[in-house]
Regions:
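Glycan-processing catalytic domains of CAZymes
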Residues: 1-199
Length: 199
């Protein structure tokens, strides 16, 4: 299945928004859980920082949907930006309306793990995010296009992931290589694993 079969449309973007802010789930559940723990542990002197993911406006998608009475065409950067700004604005509006007691919105995460499809799109997105006083995060996969240029792409923080745990054919030296790459390019590290890591 290629990228062209996976393009989410406005309806799917809206569905994701609804899931993020669903009562009793996701952020709501996290906020309630923290409230329960405060009763036992005491109130911390901070709010827990939340970073929310941004779907990628896939280049050349022409069936995403309408915004302000106009059908968006993602072969045009202005339309990619319009959709992404709409999504960011919705996240900001809903987060504020939810009035979480223990959560604070720190910024946004670019979910695409490579720069193969978005070109320089992240730069104006970053500018918009910064205008809102928020930060922009990225976690490129191992040897992802653009990883070493993460600052030039507009990100404030980037985490290198080694893509090591789930493929047993990859030698453990990948971890050393990924750490060396991260040090060289001023990145943090992110490790993905499942329950087998503690077995």
């Amino acid at each position: 299945v290629g990228y062209e079969h996976l393009n989410a449309r406005k309806g799917e973007w809206a569905w994701l928004l609804d899931r993020i802010f669903e009562e009793g789930k996701s952020l709501s559940a996290l906020d309630a859980c923290i409230t329960e723990q405060i009763a036992e542990l005491g109130k911390p002197g901070f709010k827990h920082q939340i970073v929310l993911g941004l779907p990628e406006a896939i280049l050349d998608q022409k069936d995403w949907g309408e915004l302000d009475g106009r059908t968006l065409d993602f072969s045009k950067e202005e339309d990619q930006l319009a959709a992404t700004r709409w999504y960011i604005d919705e996240l900001m509006k809903r987060f504020k309306a939810a009035k979480y007691k223990n959560l604070e919105l720190s910024g946004f995460y670019w979910v695409a793990e490579t720069n193969n499809y978005c070109g320089q799109l992240t730069v104006p997105i970053s500018e918009y995010i910064h205008s809102l006083g928020k930060l922009f995060y990225w976690i490129p996969y191992w040897q992802s296009k653009g990883a070493e240029d993460w600052k030039a792409l507009g990100f404030d923080v980037a985490y290198q992931q080694p893509n090591h745990f789930f493929n047993h054919s990859i030698p453990d030296s990948r971890l050393d290589d990924a750490c060396a790459f991260a040090r060289k390019h001023g990145m943090a590290m992110e490790f993905e694993f499942d329950e087998k890591a503690t077995a």
